[in-house]
Amino acid sequence: MPEITTIFNDGRADADIITALQEKSVEVREWTTELIKLYEPTEHTIVRDKQTRKDKVRSDGTTDVAARIYLGLEKLLVSRITSFMFANPPKRLYHNTEENDTRKNIAKAIELIYKHARIDSENIKRGKAYFASCEVFTIWYTVESPNTLYGFPSKYKLKCKSYSPMDGVKLYPLLDERDDMIAMSFEYTKKRGAESISFFETYTADKHYLWEQSGTGWKRIVDGEKISIMKIPGVYNWRPEPFY
């Protein structure tokens, strides 16, 4: 697999760069019509089955529609396993803070970041996406907004957002031969008036890129925005098969 620097630095056209970034490095069950019909009870076969559950036609021509009752056990299973993990919110432990005020303040700030990012409700969303659609990506980002939410004056707020196939987002993790992530890309659509516009976004350890679909091609609208922490600012989780 080519190094990420090669993908961006060998003079490729934007369409070719995106094609290379779409080389998904993990194998997961795709969130297609097949899985959706399993997960969504209203899509179960019994709802439309008129062969094994036939309607009864009376002698006077009236029809008694057969009872077709679906059971959303797959969705219930996903909800239950997510509740097992997150109904009682995980608690984080901080060591070696007892006699160090600086460390205590850091731990307090971390907890306030999670609180104001609503991490507990975000975890529920992430859990359902992970167990139902096999993958989820959570990105952390800053918003310029002066505040004192974290116990000290700050110019920025730290927020997070999760993406999954259940939201119509395609995820493309790119790993090297040691399974270290070298790029994380995702493709999504947004409404602009009556028009749906496709976007392709990529994060590497030091750069952020964003393309917008323009006509039949792609237009780069964020070209290598610097990531100062030198890490992909997100977490990707995946499993080969759905929990159900």
Please provide the spans of the model-predicted regions.
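Extended, helix-rich architectural segments
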Residues: M1-M166, L175-D179
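Structured, contiguous alpha/beta core segments that scaffold functional sites
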Residues: S133, Y141-Y244
